[in-house]
Amino acid sequence: MTDLAILHVCSPNIGEAQILSVVNAAKALCGYLSVFVIGTSAVPPIGAHVSNVSVPWMKERQRDQAQIDKTVRELEGFLAGTGIPYNVESAYTEVFSVDNEVDRRARLADLVMIGADLLGDQNTLEAVLDGAWFHADVPVLFDPAASLVFDNPTVMIAWQETAEASSAVRASVPLLKLAGSVHIVIVDDNRDLRDPAPGLLSYLSSRGVENLSAEVVPRNDRLVTHVLDDHAERVGANLVVMGAYGHARLREWVFGGVTRSVVQHLTRPTFMAR
């Protein structure tokens, strides 16, 4: 049995399948669920023509706030019948303040969950991840298609001997203990194939994670994300666990990297920590 504090960050346009998946996660992990509905507003008009645009801007804000309030009421009504402990909060702010809003609510959370609604809003998503990863230092579980499985799922761990990958593994143990099988994959052209990840296998076994396997997969000049996608497909992974931002965040933002590519092309539930 686990007892996690789960923070689900969503937009006012959250779908029914998404909230059902979050509730299932809270039930499976015996968790307390906090839902944070975040709406982003346009920057207030400034300059010589403020009087010409302020009325439309105010009307847009009123419409947005009304939608947020409606979503909060609907979520509270739905969650009241689920039998799980919960609370619902909301905020309406400019996108450059989203990271701080998420940080305040995520500091005492064990896990942040994000669904399809935010994955389709790149600016808000980046601000939410900034608040979760770089301010609150909390792992994030992405559920792009509301397809999380908690009844003996197949889990793939993308393993590197880095602090970020280690953090992801430690934080995901409650999920790994629910797994029917856990496949550890190491993407490396030069790694010894005979005894991959003995330390990780020992650690997971000591935590009660069962049905473990590990293998090294060569990169062969392919992108790491493609190698991981192919392997996840081959083993039928319902969930991928991996570290986030092994390189400097600025470097990944400028040049791209595994974390950025994975987040931009998510197709299956993915647990990431740094």
PLM segments and residue spans:
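Short histidine/acidic/glycine/proline-rich micro-motifs that form metal-
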Residues: 12-13, 61-62, 92-93, 118-120, ...
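A short acidic, glycine-rich active-site loop
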Residues: 55-70
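Gly/Ser-rich helix-loop-strand patches that form or flank binding pockets
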Residues: 19, 26-28, 101-148, 231-274
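Amphipathic coiled-coil/heptad-repeat helices and related helical stalk/stem segments
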Residues: 18-19, 98, 125, 165-168, ...
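Short, ordered loop/turn segments at secondary-structure junctions
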Residues: 38-41, 93, 117-118, 145-147, ...
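P-loop/Walker A phosphate-binding loop and immediately adjacent motor/lid segment at beta-alpha junctions
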Residues: 75, 80-81, 85, 123-144, ...
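Small/aliphatic-rich secondary-structure junction motif
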Residues: 1-56, 135-138, 150-218, 237
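Structural beta-alpha unit
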Residues: 33, 40, 77-112, 207-240, ...
